């Protein structure tokens, strides 16, 4: 039985909770944490997680020996600290995208994983959809011949109010805009299908959101 703690009770947490609840013979959620504990309490009630303990800080959970896996569902600027703390405490971690808000933080997370022997995963669910898995098979087997060009578009509407949430829209807390927020799925998928690029040329801009520092449009060419 994998004993799970979910850190962050915001909009993405139900996806993680439902995923674990789909396998009751293999997973059990034993803890929920949010800086606003009443949000965690609501998730506990909504999903009938009767045995789950509520916390307001992830540090309160580090010494628990009955946690095997931690889902990190918090804003990007907190990912590195939380993931590193839990890996050093002997827990495996599943981190929501984006991995972190800077490359330096990503490097520290990877280094900690190697040092501790913990397992760290980053959410990239598109790899596991049937169409993408079929594309991967076609690319790997050469069924379609040599692929000379691939194009990915991620046209995702973000209304002006999207950035009214306190942590969204700043370089410090979110680390980026559309590129890290949703295009990261397409970048991951393209890299998985085609391999890592040798050269990247990109343009980022904020065209429509005066309440955000980060980009709301990005265009890149990968070679």
Task: Annotate the PLM regions.
Residues 1-48:
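N-terminal Rossmann-like dinucleotide-binding module
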Residues 3, 28-29, 66-69, 92, ...:
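Structural signature of beta-strand start/N-cap positions in the alpha/beta core
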Residues 27-29, 51, 67, 147, ...:
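Core-facing hydrophobic residues within beta-strands of well-ordered domains
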Residues 220-223:
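Active-site beta-strand termini and strand-to-loop segments that position acidic
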Residues 119, 126-212:
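Predominantly a Rossmann-like dinucleotide-binding segment in NAD(P)-dependent oxidoreductases
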């Amino acid at each position: 039985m994998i004993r799970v703690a979910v850190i962050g009770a915001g909009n993405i947490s139900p996806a993680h909770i439902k995923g674990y609840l789909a396998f009751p013979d293999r997973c059990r959620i034993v803890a929920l944490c949010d800086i606003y504990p009443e949000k965690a309490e609501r998730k506990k009630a909504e999903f009938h997680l009767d045995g789950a303990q509520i916390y307001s800080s992830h540090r309160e959970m580090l010494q628990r020996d009955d946690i095997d896996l931690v889902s990190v569902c918090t804003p990007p600027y907190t990912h590195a600290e939380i993931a590193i703390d839990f890996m050093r405490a002997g827990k495996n971690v599943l981190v929501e995208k984006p991995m972190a808000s800077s490359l330096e933080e990503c490097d520290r997370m990877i280094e900690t994983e190697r040092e501790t022997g913990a397992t760290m995963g980053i959410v990239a669910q598109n790899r596991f959809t049937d169409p993408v898995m079929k594309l991967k098979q076609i690319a790997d087997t050469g069924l379609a011949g040599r692929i000379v060009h691939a194009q990915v578009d991620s046209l995702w509407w973000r209304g002006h109010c999207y950035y009214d949430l306190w942590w969204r829209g700043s370089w410090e807390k979110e680390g980026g805009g559309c590129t890290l927020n949703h295009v990261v799925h397409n970048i991951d998928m393209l890299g998985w299908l085609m391999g890592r690029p040798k050269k990247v040329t990109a343009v980022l801009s904020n065209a429509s959101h005066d309440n955000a520092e980060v980009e709301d449009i990005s265009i890149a060419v990968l070679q």
